[in-house]
Amino acid sequence: MKQLRLNPISKVHGTVNIPGSKSISNRALLLATLAEGKTRLTNLLDSDDIRHMLTALKQLGVNYQLSDNNRVCEVEGLSGVINSDTAQTLFLGNAGTAMRPLCAALTLGSGEFTLTGEPRMEERPIGDLVDALNALGADIRYLKQPGFPPLTINATGLNGGDVEIAGDLSSQFLTALLMVTPLAKAQVNIKIKGELVSKPYIDITIALMAQFGVTVINHDYQRFEIPAGQKYVSPGTVLVEGDASSASYFLAAGAIQGGEVKVTGVGLKSIQGDVKFAEVLEAMGAQIEWGDDFIIARSAPLHGVDLDMNHIPDAAMTIATAALFATGTTTLRNIYNWRIKETDRLAAMATELRKVGAEVEEGHDYIRVTAPAQLNTADIDTYNDHRMAMCFSLMAFADCGITINDPDCTSKTFPDYFAQFAALAQ
């Protein structure tokens, strides 16, 4: 197993241009596919999850041209649904942002499609989405465990009508439904059961759909109306914002050990909810400055916070490790959906924080972290989870440094993360 030793870093300073958002990249690729006309996507993320989506689209007959650096993609839209005369099997790795939306999109046209992935993908639930699609007239069947991939879709189109979907597991289920229902045969009305997690990710979806000319009526995140008879039309060019979740590590670095760290590609005009991570750092005591397309973090003494993090669960992970450098106790609440991500992130985070000496209480849907008087070095297991690796890079600001096991797992969203992180310490 590959290991990366991070020696102690006493100061960070500099500017980081954040790579494109994973969430926006894969949504935009799918909408460009369904749209009328050619769409030019700029600042596309170059990572494993995006490659899985691109490979699947090519296999499905979608024509696109990718630039040499993989950051610009011109997609020739299908002016509607995906059809296939031959049975297709698509391997989607551990990319939830490809698996869930493609599962929904492939029900719209005609053909037989089998969706598979890595072993972890077979543990990530998809049942609520499948139930909703089947209720709208789809024919989706599980090949192994009910409620989980792999699965087979016999596509004949979506009828429309009323449907319910659970809101408390993953916003990706609702995102997938929202993106495909404008192309159903009749109006679709979606009712949300329970509290909707990660509402800002739904805002991203609706904003992108609007860019492609499609309307969703949002009744306070409890009910969504998607009128029939709509079509996606290319807006010409779509700029993919920097990934706000990826920005969180650099902003935390500035807050802990700045200097001054400036991240560009996200800011006041961002459509991503994870930019609110900077407000959490501010609540902990950091100095934050905002621009339309940048955020600056400067260090100040940090103290613990007690917050509901349901709206920004991915970025919330960074607060769990930033808490190692704060006085007092930090409690992150309403984060059950950490458990169904790339790994069970609640259990993994608790285990690894204890290795470095933190006092940790792991609840069903919360984590409580108290920093020790002295942090310990350790070999941090990353669980094939990019965010675990990036979160624990912050331990380089301890006097003892840290070793990251399997650092290349960051290729899922940020292949050159550790090089960019090291550059701030020069």
UniProtKB/Swiss-Prot annotation:
GO CC aspect terms: cytoplasm
Subcellular localization: Cytoplasm
InterPro entries, per the entry: Enolpyruvate_Tfrase_dom, Enolpyruvate_Tfrase_sf, EPSP_synthase, EPSP_synthase_CS, RNA3'P_cycl/enolpyr_Trfase_a/b
Reaction(s) this enzyme catalyzes, per UniProt: 3-phosphoshikimate + phosphoenolpyruvate = 5-O-(1-carboxyvinyl)-3-phosphoshikimate + phosphate
Broad class of where this protein is predominantly found: cytoplasm
Pathway: Metabolic intermediate biosynthesis; chorismate biosynthesis; chorismate from D-erythrose 4-phosphate and phosphoenolpyruvate: step 6/7
Pfam families registered for this protein in UniProt: EPSP_synthase
Cited CDD domains: EPSP_synthase (cd01556)
Active-site feature positions: D314
GO molecular function, one term: 3-phosphoshikimate 1-carboxyvinyltransferase activity
The protein's Enzyme Commission number: 2.5.1.19
Binding site for phosphoenolpyruvate: K22, G96, R124, Q172, R345, R387, K412
GO biological process, one term: amino acid biosynthetic process
The protein's name: 3-phosphoshikimate 1-carboxyvinyltransferase
Species of the source: Shewanella loihica (strain ATCC BAA-1088 / PV-4)
Phylogenetic classification of the source organism: Bacteria, Pseudomonadati, Pseudomonadota, Gammaproteobacteria, Alteromonadales
